[in-house]
């Protein structure tokens, strides 16, 4: 499902002494099935932007066209848009409320008017895709789970509604390295299983480099960079000027390059760096 944002501006508390422009004439197009990362320093406008795409905030001016429908129009039922655009907030485990995992995940699909068989099918599929065995976990209380497992339940609750667009606000925030890896792997599987359009908000450049196809960079309410991983992370000076950085491994390979090692500069993941460094070592061994 395509998303087109045209001249979007949002002003908090207009006309008051606390007036603040959070979005300033933003123009973005996202194609059906894209995996887009949204990055920016705290206060850059990321969260405000994603809440507009879900219809939680009303634009001060501009248009948001989702699947051909302008959701800023007064005639549009936002409840219908939210069935198509799922939003998983940061620390979504705080939104869990039911006595069992199955009931919690089933809450959304039930409100779509599905029958019991359809709801059960969606719950099982969503649990499977986030790595929670249905028979093992369905009757457990979500409050007895680890942080990473709670996060999976919360994501499954949105996924079970089978939205066309899934927005994830820092899905790996606060998790240990293993939990972080697991969640990111599940997000990749969601993209493959449902062919969703995914928008990932993240502060981690390493996470973005691993799984996103395209990166949007926000600063002071504007989208200042838009491109592939390679295109955006090659703009080191611009990123650093707005309080961001490239992945740490990129700084490492650039340091090696400056010492005249024959290694590409545009490396953004540990896996890529490992492969290139192994090539260097093997090449050095051949000359010995």
From Swiss-Prot:
Pfam families: ABC_tran (PF00005). ATP binds at residues 40-47. Signal peptide: none annotated. It is a peripheral membrane protein. InterPro entries: AAA+_ATPase (IPR003593), ABC_transporter-like_ATP-bd (IPR003439), ABC_transporter-like_CS (IPR017871), ABC_transpr_CbiO/EcfA_su (IPR015856), ECF_ABC_transporter_ATP-bd (IPR050095), EcfA2 (IPR030946), P-loop_NTPase (IPR027417). ATP-binding (A) component of a common energy-coupling factor (ECF) ABC-transporter complex. Unlike classic ABC transporters this ECF transporter provides the energy necessary to transport a number of different substrates. Forms a stable energy-coupling factor (ECF) transporter complex composed of 2 membrane-embedded substrate-binding proteins (S component), 2 ATP-binding proteins (A component) and 2 transmembrane proteins (T component). This is Energy-coupling factor transporter ATP-binding protein EcfA2. It comes from Clostridium novyi (strain NT). The gene is ecfA2.
């Amino acid at each position: 499902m395509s998303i087109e944002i045209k001249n979007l501006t949002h002003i908090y508390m207009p006309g008051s002494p606390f007036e603040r422009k959070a979005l300033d004439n933003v123009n973005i197009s996202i194609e059906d099935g894209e995996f887009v990362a949204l990055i920016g320093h705290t206060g850059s406008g990321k969260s405000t932007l994603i809440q507009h795409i879900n219809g939680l905030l009303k634009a001060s001016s501009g248009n948001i066209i989702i699947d051909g429908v302008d959701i800023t129009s007064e005639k549009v039922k936002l409840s219908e848009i939210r069935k198509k655009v799922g939003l998983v907030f940061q620390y979504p485990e705080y939104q869990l409320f039911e006595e069992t995992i199955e009931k919690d995940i089933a809450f959304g699909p039930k409100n779509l008017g599905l029958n019991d068989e359809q709801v059960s099918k969606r719950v099982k599929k969503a649990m499977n895709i986030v790595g929670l065995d249905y028979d093992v976990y369905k009757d457990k209380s979500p409050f007895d789970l680890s942080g990473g497992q709670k996060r999976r339940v919360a994501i499954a609750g949105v996924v079970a509604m089978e939205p066309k667009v899934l927005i994830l606000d820092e899905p790996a925030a606060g998790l240990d390295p293993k939990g972080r890896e697991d969640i990111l792997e599940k997000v990749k599987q969601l993209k493959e299983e449902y062919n969703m359009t995914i928008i990932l908000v993240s502060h981690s450049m390493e996470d973005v480099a691993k799984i996103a196809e395209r990166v949007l960079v926000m600063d002071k309410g504007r989208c200042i960079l838009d491109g592939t991983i390679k295109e955006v992370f090659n703009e080191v000076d611009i990123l650093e000027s707005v309080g961001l950085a490239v992945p740490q491994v990129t700084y490492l390979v650039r340091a090696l390059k400056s010492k005249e090692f024959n290694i590409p500069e545009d490396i953004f993941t540990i896996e890529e760096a490992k492969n290139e460094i192994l090539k260097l070592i093997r090449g050095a061994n051949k000359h010995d």
